[in-house]
Amino acid sequence: MCLILSIFTLIAFHIPFFRHVLSCLEGGFNGMIITTSLAVLMLALNYFFYYLLLYSGRFVGKCILAFTFIADAVSLYFINAYEVLITDKMMGNVFNTQYSEASGFFSMSAILYILFLGIIPCIYIFRRKVDYGTFRRFLSNVGISLAIAVSVALVNMKNWPWIDKNATELGSLLMPWSYTVNTVRYYSAEKKRNAKEILLPDARIATDSRDVCV
């Protein structure tokens, strides 16, 4: 189930991501390596995330997964319809926009996005019986997915400067990481911005004697 969901996530929600990747690459063998590596890395990390949620959360994990697919569908709609990037500033706009204002950005195509890319996967998630297996199997599957992710990262060490250069755009097109990570970043920035300044007490002379500072 987790592998199916990972493949579906890669294919259904990441066409804008790979379109941007290909537009930033010069092509050739190295470009093919980067593109393939990103696809494998996304499969491994999403598999790890889905498996961890389902095994540890059971029904609650299914609910969280269902929410992420609906959120993925909504995010993809805005990316395709309005060519936006899901950054921390974008998430700030989302949280500070009233429903009456936000409803004007939705159209009939948004309903289709949510239905086919959100609701139908949710039905599959809740109707599919999950074989959780043993804890040993859990550790094995989690370990394999992490090993694949680390291996891909190590193989592409020479390509990390390119990834770092395009990190903002790439991260804003990744599902479900774009809105989850940038939501945390937004609230973290808001917390720092709204933190009250702690004033120190007024300076005073502790003794009446005259001291000489050298």
Regions found by a protein language model. Name each.
Residues 156-214:
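Membrane-interface segments at or immediately adjacent to transmembrane helices
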